[in-house]
Amino acid sequence: MIFFLFIQAVLNIALVMSDPDMEGIYLFKAQLIPFLCALPFIFKRDFRKNFSKMLYSYCGIGFLSLAIDYALRSHVGLIQLATVFVPLALYGLFHFAVWNVQRAKERFSLAALAMSSLSWGLYAFAFPPLPLGPGALVFLVPWFIVLLRSNMQTALFASFWSGFIYNVINYYWIYNVMNVGPAVLIMIGLILLISYFSVYNTIAAAVFVKARDVKIKGIPVLLILFPLFYAGLEMTRSIGDFSFPWSHLGYALGNQLPLLQALSIIGIFGYTAIIIASNLAVAEAFVKGKKFLIAAPVVIFALLFGYGSFVLSKPEAAPFYMENEAEAPKVAVVQPNIHQTNKWNKAYYDSVVSKTWQIVNDSVDWKSGDLDLVVLPETAIPDFIRFRSREKLWLKNRIKGTQTSLFIGALDFDREGKPPRPVNLYNSGFLFRPDEKNYTRYIKTHLVPFSERLPFDDVFPILNYVDVGQGNFVPGKERPVFEPYFWSPFICYETIYGAEARRSIRNGSRLMVDITNDGWFGKSTAAAQHLNQLRYRAIENGYPIVRCTNTGISAFVDQYGHEDLKTELYTERVITRRIPLRSRDTLYFHIGDAVEYGLLGFFFAYLAALFIRLKTWASAQP
């Protein structure tokens, strides 16, 4: 083994010293040499006996060589990258397959998988637009029964694959969003993404199994606190470049407005904790005979419904209360219904823009004279606006002589980027005012990972050389508020981040205007789920919302979550109404940041407490 390591070290040092004069991700055939020299060792008995150690050593030396090469010259050899990570990935997949085969041979493991799949399969159908939301309070009971009765290996097996099924059902539409490259790469990427999401279920299962038997003075404290841990686990999906906080469990109750009013107190993560607590209580009732716990879902439902009904019975909670006040702006939302395949095809550009302009001219009520704002969707101009003088002139002329502003989505760029992309690309919104010569630009701050940008491309500039058809946008930093109606622009994916809504309100905003192109989702449930998430933001913060989409669902949402003029998918519509500005203060607006970062801290504290308790318990054993 020492000879093998020596050979690999010498070869990798030689590769680093060879210093190929190439930029970015480069091809250098000599990087195959360490891999080819490693192959003969496979036929040695000692190598096969210590295959894992040899493989990890080989990959470790190769990774160190890659890191040094990147640190010195800011480039990476594609061949070396492949010869280091592909063997490790194949080895991991082999062991994962063997582990799954072993679990599948166990009858109880298959039964556990069936029960867990029933749970998560049902839960996937609890989200809007389906009306099964209240079932979320009991759908996960079979999964928790499995976790209460299974060993670690069975729990992990059942949780990963049932999570995979759940995520396939819940995220099947991602294929349409990712459809920007070779089909094989898209499918591989989709499988990896679904697997990544499923890891969260697996982590929850592993922690639960470890925590279930830990007691402090006979009380299963960690088990009692598990709902808060799960909420903290969901919070981890809201931070970092990989963040994708789309399907938090609490979103399942979105179709029942009375059930949502407690969002103003506990927010989305509080709802997740309540749902986990309800399911765990019923599972405990079945497994441990604590029959009184079986009433938990009924009690929780009654409390949520009772509180929500009380809140909605107040006069100020009437739909769009104070809509006729002078300060309530009159807003027109244009849904042009441009098919996605035409939208980004240059051959259709003129027809796409002409159709949009015709709708704006013919269907918007310009004659009333009291229209304050016209809103068009994300990338309604499917090009860089600074190259389109004709379109800018048309927009300025359209609002000239009126009191109406116009907000529209388009692309933009500047030349302040870094190599290899000296140009920064922006997904933007542009506000045209009748009394101003120039427009005001807003840049989208949260970009969809892998679709609009590669995660950590600012930390590792080498990723800017990777091109598999994804967007290469740069995020903005500002959260502006536009006068005179104190509204803040949001673009698409940003609205699922509660912290951004609170940030805009702290900046003085009293109305959210969201533009999006949900045409990427196709005819799927994603558009309804997206609107549902906006509804949660409205109730959490008492924040009215105007939503404008390309293909639907456009709508107006008031500060209690009432919806009005909700459009159908793939219809051409213009909807217009007055929308009252924010006049409701909520507890969660004030404590939301503390709650969410508190849950994040609790997540890590829970893991630390579990580790310390298990270590103490193990050391106390004879």
State the predicted function of each range.
Residues I2-E316, K523, L534-R537, C548-T551, ...:
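Membrane-embedded alpha-helical bundles of multi-pass enzymes
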Residues I300-A332, H339-N342:
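Hydrophobic alpha-helical transmembrane segments in integral membrane proteins
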Residues F127-P142, Y166-W173, Q335-P336, G369-F384, ...:
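Short, conserved active-site loops that position catalytic residues or coordinate cofactors/metal ions
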Residues I359-D372:
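Phosphate/pyrophosphate-binding loops at sites that engage ATP/ADP/AMP, CoA/4′-phosphopantetheine
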Residues K330-V334, S488-F490:
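Short, well-ordered beta-strand segments
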Residues Y348-D350, L373-P622:
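Solvent-exposed soluble domains appended to multi-pass membrane proteins
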Residues G267, V333-N345, T379-A380:
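Membrane-interface junction motifs in transport/secretion proteins
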Residues V177, H339-S354, L454:
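Acidic/histidine-rich helix-loop elements
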